[in-house]
């Protein structure tokens, strides 16, 4: 099993470094999720407006 698969980072030795690494990964995932939701909402609004016209 690769170190990245089980959530550990081999070069990160301290608990604080591990937490920082996990937080950065989660923030990146959350950012992508937010962007996808915003894109879908805008797409839905545009399609809804076209149907009303």
From Swiss-Prot:
GO biological process, one term: shoot system development
Keyword Membrane belongs to the record: yes
Protein name in UniProt: Small polypeptide DEVIL 16
List of glycosylated residues: 6
Residue ranges of the TM segments: 30-46
Gene source species: Arabidopsis thaliana (Mouse-ear cress)
Gene inactivation effect: No visible phenotype.
Region of interest (Required for DVL/RTFL small polypeptide activity), residue spans: 14-45
Keyword flag Membrane: yes
Compartments it resides in: Cell membrane
Family: Belongs to the DVL/RTFL small polypeptides family.
UniProt membrane topology term: Single-pass membrane protein
Tissue-level expression: Mostly expressed in stems, flower buds, flowers and seedling shoots, to a lesser extent, in roots and young cauline leaves, but not in mature rosette leaves. Barely observed in cotyledons and leaf primordia.
Highest rank taxon of the organism: Eukaryota
Cited function: Small polypeptide acting as a regulatory molecule which coordinates cellular responses required for differentiation, growth and development, probably by restricting polar cell proliferation in lateral organs (e.g. leaves) and coordinating socket cell recruitment and differentiation at trichome sites. Regulates the positional cue and cell proliferation along the body axis.
A GO cellular-component term linked to this record: plasma membrane
PANTHER family registered for this protein in UniProt: DVL19-RELATED-RELATED
Pfam families referenced in this protein's UniProt entry, alphabetically: DVL (PF08137)
Organism placement in taxonomy: Eukaryota, Viridiplantae, Streptophyta, Embryophyta, Tracheophyta
């Amino acid at each position: 099993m690769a170190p990245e698969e089980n959530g550990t980072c081999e070069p990160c030795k301290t608990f604080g470094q591990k937490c920082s690494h996990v937080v950065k990964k989660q923030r990146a995932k959350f950012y992508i999720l937010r962007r996808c939701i915003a894109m879908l909402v805008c797409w839905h609004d545009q399609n809804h407006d076209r149907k009303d016209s």
